[in-house]
Amino acid sequence: MQHIFAFFCTGFLGAVVGANFPNNIQIGGLFPNQQSQEHAAFRFALSQLTEPPKLLPQIDIVNISDSFEMTYRFCSQFSKGVYAIFGFYERRTVNMLTSFCGALHVCFITPSFPVDTSNQFVLQLRPELQDALISIIDHYKWQKFVYIYDADRGLSVLQKVLDTAAEKNWQVTAVNILTTTEEGYRMLFQDLEKKKERLVVVDCESERLNAILGQIIKLEKNGIGYHYILANLGFMDIDLNKFKESGANVTGFQLVNYTDTIPAKIMQQWKNSDARDHTRVDWKRPKYTSALTYDGVKVMAEAFQSLRRQRIDISRRGNAGDCLANPAVPWGQGIDIQRALQQVRFEGLTGNVQFNEKGRRTNYTLHVIEMKHDGIRKIGYWNEDDKFVPAATDAQAGGDNSSVQNRTYIVTTILEDPYVMLKKNANQFEGNDRYEGYCVELAAEIAKHVGYSYRLEIVSDGKYGARDPDTKAWNGMVGELVYGRADVAVAPLTITLVREEVIDFSKPFMSLGISIMIKKPQKSKPGVFSFLDPLAYEIWMCIVFAYIGVSVVLFLVSRFSPYEWHSEEFEEGRDQTTSDQSNEFGIFNSLWFSLGAFMQQGCDISPRSLSGRIVGGVWWFFTLIIISSYTANLAAFLTVERMVSPIESAEDLAKQTEIAYGTLEAGSTKEFFRRSKIAVFEKMWTYMKSAEPSVFVRTTEEGMIRVRKSKGKYAYLLESTMNEYIEQRKPCDTMKVGGNLDSKGYGIATPKGSALRNPVNLAVLKLNEQGLLDKLKNKWWYDKGECGSGGGDSKDKTSALSLSNVAGVFYILIGGLGLAMLVALIEFCYKSRSESKRMKGFCLIPQQSINEAIRTSTLPRNSGAGASSGGSGENGRVVSHDFPKSMQSIPCMSHSSGMPLGATGL
């Protein structure tokens, strides 16, 4: 019964894990020769695979230069149900293969020469060489040289060289030796000798390259003064023994470094293999194409294992597909396999194996080798980021690095976001691949530049490193280095004096300082009259006084200046013997003129005198500056939501007790306050060490949580870089206030006297000069931020205007309208009451006398605004009718009293 139950459980688990995923994966193989080293490497790589699914090869031996045969074999394997095909091609067959792969969605993995294609279903294992070749030519400062090439490899490298030659004014003589005979070689080199061409680039495959070098030796063109650059990735695959004694200089590239740990281990396993197919391999010089073949098999294995873990159904059911169907029917699961292949990344025989979105190798390193009469030596390396790095840099970085490269170093670090973090699916990885973060990538770059293998180990106590005051023992990462448990510390480890006494630091890879983290306060709501905020209260008061003062001055100068008074124009029929002088700038008109100018609206009157115009001009200039300044500030004040921070600096913290503040329990920040002699920091340290409950926290995460839960009653002191990172993480409720309290840096630490000190130091300087350190910080701080482009980094956030921002403007409008209605009502009542009183006292005058008085009266020439109103006008004159003297003595009786009234009673 137990056996049945166990069998059932095993079957159920297998069905869950590998649901819809085949246990056996058919892969194709197209090889030009069954006895080739590449074929042996292919079979050996398959024999080393242990994890499911199992790769079953379908191998065909084919003439890779025959398009018809290649088409037949390709379609045959596709019809048999292969999931991917590994093989070689030549110039005559590459277009056919890429066309079929793109149409059918079948992935083709090849170690052949790279081609410029946008077909992502062709995975090119061989790195591109053109950029590295140009870097070497530029390093040697060649201006005139010969480029010998084989057209069978394509023309991409030659085209790149010619394009660069046009930019840099190089003189390049290109020679195609595809069909060159032995006599042709002789004539070629004789012609080059006549032209004194002794700088030559040879771009050929290894077999043809050996033949060309043989002709060079035979024609004795390998003496002193000749310099050959071999545009080939297998410098060690070529027989150069006869060049050692000749004096010629030969430079080339080596993709595989068989002295590295991984290649040496794999090569030893291959050499010791008992498989019969491997016995004919030349173990002294395995070719780089064989290493590419081995890595190609591993690429396929890694991709299918990834698909199996993700439970992606790629099984081929029913008809396997017709290769020659018209129109071609693409394989539905092909795109999933293509994506999985491009996402593979591992350290293989050829170094870092990684592909870009076009299926080409990326992030690879080429070793630059040179052979002179004194032997073969490495003169540097080339990669996509650094370009060519001469070996002189390596020598300065610690002399001979062979001792560095012959062991695996322990790199201690600490789990701290975003420096070192466990991946979400860390249980699916092993070793260094389980981690990600700024320091993880930095450690990889340092190891690549120095040239050593390493293993990341998280410090057991989770501390950076401090000395116990009682036992004098070091803990944390510093203790790991001091007591020999680690070789390097790559972490946010602050460079301090006490640490520098026991360990060595590199140059800082990041500059920072102690900063203050608080909980982000609530945004303050704008006041009703927030539109007045752009100018201070004192300025508004000064503007009011200036307005009144200008109006009074304008009134006075208008009264004193004779040019401000003017006569009214006479109307036709008016007696011109009388002359009325008027002045438009009474006190009310002066106030109205000043208000109109300040509001930039103007009015109907303007000063006539020079003094009045001076007053108006300076007032206009004053209002121009004030209004412009107000408008400039108004946009910022109305569209920015402001947060009122309870503290803005360390001084604010020190002089209050309501908000508690603390640091990490063991770290450089605590040591800074403990050792500081600055009064403010001494006061803060006195508070922190005596505060109850304790204000110190064990981890940065604990401090962050305490800030968030304290409701603004706790401030955490930490490095500015970590503060900025936390500010960018959800729930985006913390913020950095004030400037940094000090200035320091993070460094890579090594034990005292370590051989890694100088190499690591120079590597950090190089990464800084290349801008890689800034790129890494932007990647892990801001590109991966969760608080938007503004993030928590800004205390002010631009937003649209709300009604509360401009409510005061509407209140003033409503108030002004109400006041106008009230004043109009008062004016109406006052006028009605005045008219009523006047009418009651009006005397009765005979109609004939009144008519005669009206006919004989003299009217002013220009009634104007003041004349039409009667009584005293704004212009300072009195307008009245001039009745004849005969009418002035007419007696009249009041209706009320019957008393006689004179003309003056009117």
UniProtKB/Swiss-Prot annotation:
Residues carrying lipid (S-palmitoyl cysteine): 603, 829
Keyword set includes Metal-binding: no
Residues annotated with Phosphoserine modification: 645, 710, 849, 863
Catalyzed reaction equations: Ca(2+)(in) = Ca(2+)(out); Na(+)(in) = Na(+)(out); Mg(2+)(in) = Mg(2+)(out); Li(+)(in) = Li(+)(out)
Domain of life: Eukaryota
Membrane topology recorded in Swiss-Prot or TrEMBL: Multi-pass membrane protein
Parts of the chain on the Extracellular side: 19-536, 631-805
Renumbered residue ranges of the record's region Disordered: 861-880
Intramembrane portions: 585-600, 601-603
Result after altering residue 627 to T: In MRD67; decreased AMPA glutamate receptor activity; no effect on localization to the cell membrane
Effect listed in the UniProt record for changing residue 345 to Q: In MRD67; uncertain significance; no effect on localization to the cell membrane; does not affect AMPA glutamate receptor activity
Coiled coil location: none
Subunit and interaction comment: Homotetramer or heterotetramer of pore-forming glutamate receptor subunits; heteromeric assembly can be the result of both receptor subtype and flip or flop form and according the composition, one partner can be dominant with respect to the fast desensitizing current component, whereas the other can determine the steady-state component. Tetramers may be formed by the dimerization of dimers. Found in a complex with GRIA2, GRIA3, GRIA4, CNIH2, CNIH3, CACNG2, CACNG3, CACNG4, CACNG5, CACNG7 and CACNG8. Interacts with HIP1 and RASGRF2. Interacts with SYNDIG1 and GRIA2.
Family: Belongs to the glutamate-gated ion channel (TC 1.A.10.1) family. GRIA1 subfamily.
Miscellaneous notes: The postsynaptic actions of L-glutamate are mediated by a variety of receptors that are named according to their selective agonists. This receptor binds AMPA (quisqualate) > L-glutamate > kainate.
Disease: Intellectual developmental disorder, autosomal dominant 67: An autosomal dominant disorder characterized by global development delay and impaired intellectual development apparent from infancy or early childhood. Additional features may include behavioral abnormalities, and language and sleeping difficulties. Intellectual developmental disorder, autosomal recessive 76: An autosomal recessive disorder characterized by global developmental delay, severely impaired intellectual development, absent speech, seizures, sleep disturbances, and feeding difficulties.
Protein name: Glutamate receptor 1
Organism expressing this protein natively: Homo sapiens
Chain's gene name: GRIA1
